[in-house]
């Protein structure tokens, strides 16, 4: 059984027991989170596609940890001008473990 749900402006295909990183959620570590923006649920041969959402569809997850991703360097360089600007960015994330999918 797997589901496709939307969180943080992105769509994720998940199954039970899977761990994934989402955009930062404002919840405590160890808390349970429910996602009701479910776009599709597949249970064996039976596939339910929402228009746009599946009625009564829910994905339940447990928050494992919060953290920051790897550093991304941004470099702005102007040739022949002796001008260079360098900046770094680390995006916050929330790691969750999928505990249940219901239709």
From Swiss-Prot:
Range of residues in the leader sequence: none
Pfam family, one: Ribosomal_L21p
Any one annotated GO CC term: ribonucleoprotein complex
GO biological process: translation
Keywords: Ribonucleoprotein, Ribosomal protein, RNA-binding, rRNA-binding
InterPro entries with a match to the protein in the record: bL21-like, bL21-like_sf, Ribosomal_bL21, Ribosomal_bL21_CS
Entry's Gene Ontology molecular function annotations: rRNA binding; structural constituent of ribosome
ATP-binding is among the record's keywords: no
Source species, domain of life: Bacteria
Family the entry assigns: Belongs to the bacterial ribosomal protein bL21 family.
Quaternary context: Part of the 50S ribosomal subunit. Contacts protein L20.
Reported function: This protein binds to 23S rRNA in the presence of protein L20.
NCBIfam families: L21
Name of this protein: Large ribosomal subunit protein bL21
Organism: Aliivibrio fischeri (strain ATCC 700601 / ES114) (Vibrio fischeri)
Gene that encodes it: rplU
